[in-house]
């Protein structure tokens, strides 16, 4: 994801772009609603905000891990659709990209991270744990696409096994 941002926005004035990586919510973020941490980083007029991961993680992980009730997940879908519509109503163009890597390619890249010294820093023990739930995550992603693909914020599903083609498709879409 970081490499895609670097390649696509190479040569663009960095003063107009902010990239926000999201992981597990911090203690402070957890004190607010699940959209808060992203809402505070939405772009000002004329600016670009790039979210590396996003509020969709707050549907994916709890659904796969089973620690939030189904009705709350369904309400989160509604909140997300309303949030994205509000952004559009206020002049923000919402582009959503799902960078899809095949399971075989993911295995290959995870192995590279272990074998190549210069890529070791990218490896996390949790990668293997999450990988074991591949099918569960793909099932939830399908649900996410069905429930949040809207006219004002459509999904763009980008194949990523070929890095150059991924960069081309993202740049072309933008």
Where in this protein do the model-derived segments appear?
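Conserved catalytic network of the ASCE P-loop NTPase/AAA+ motor domain
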Residues: 12-14, 28, 40-44, 86-92, ...
């Amino acid at each position: 994801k970081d490499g895609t941002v670097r390649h696509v926005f190479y040569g663009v004035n960095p003063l107009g772009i902010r990239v926000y990586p999201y992981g597990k919510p911090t203690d402070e973020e957890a004190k607010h609603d699940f959209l808060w941490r992203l809402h505070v980083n939405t772009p000002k007029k004329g600016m670009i905000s790039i979210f590396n991961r996003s509020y969709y993680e707050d549907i994916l992980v709890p659904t796969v891990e089973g620690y939030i009730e189904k009705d709350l997940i369904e309400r989160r879908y509604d909140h997300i659709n309303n949030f994205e519509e509000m952004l559009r109503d206020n002049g923000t163009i919402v582009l959503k990209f799902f960078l899809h890597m095949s399971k075989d390619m993911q295995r290959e890249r995870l192995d590279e991270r272990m074998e190549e010294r210069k890529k070791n820093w990218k490896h996390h023990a949790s990668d293997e744990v999450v990988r074991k739930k591949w099918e569960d995550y793909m099932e939830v992603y399908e649900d996410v696409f069905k429930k949040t693909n809207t006219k004002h914020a459509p999904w763009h599903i980008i194949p990523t096994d070929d890095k150059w083609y991924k960069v081309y498709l993202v740049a072309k879409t933008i």
